[in-house]
Amino acid sequence: MAKKAKVQKELKRQELVAQYAEKRKELKEKGDYVALAKLPRDSAPSRLTRRCRKTGRPRGVLRDFELSRIAFRELAHKGQIPGVKKASW
């Protein structure tokens, strides 16, 4: 389980990215890179990391489910993810 502070920090980054998205787009179209550099660092979308919705784990996150591989496996074995079943061939 990730520290609560790390998860909160990531949520704050997501809010900043959403807040400054339009302004960033306008500045990029103008080519005003000086003004773009003066925006908050955390407002850049490249600073976002994908985290597990259940545990907050930053590594091994499956994009389609937004769960870490560990949380995905647990829920899949319990049958709590619709449409997912154990493969056999």
Curated annotation (Swiss-Prot):
Gene Ontology CC entries for this record: cytoplasm; small ribosomal subunit
InterPro entries: Ribosomal_uS14, Ribosomal_uS14_bac/plastid, Ribosomal_uS14_CS, Ribosomal_uS14_sf
Pfam families per UniProt: Ribosomal_S14 (PF00253)
Biological process annotations from GO: translation
Record has Ribosomal protein as a keyword: yes
Presence of keyword DNA repair: no
Gene3D superfamilies: 30s Ribosomal Protein S14, Chain N
Quaternary assembly: Part of the 30S ribosomal subunit. Contacts proteins S3 and S10.
NCBIfam families: PRK08881.1
Biological role stated in the UniProt entry: Binds 16S rRNA, required for the assembly of 30S particles and may also be responsible for determining the conformation of the 16S rRNA at the A site.
HAMAP family per UniProt: Ribosomal_uS14_1
Name of the protein described by the UniProt record: Small ribosomal subunit protein uS14
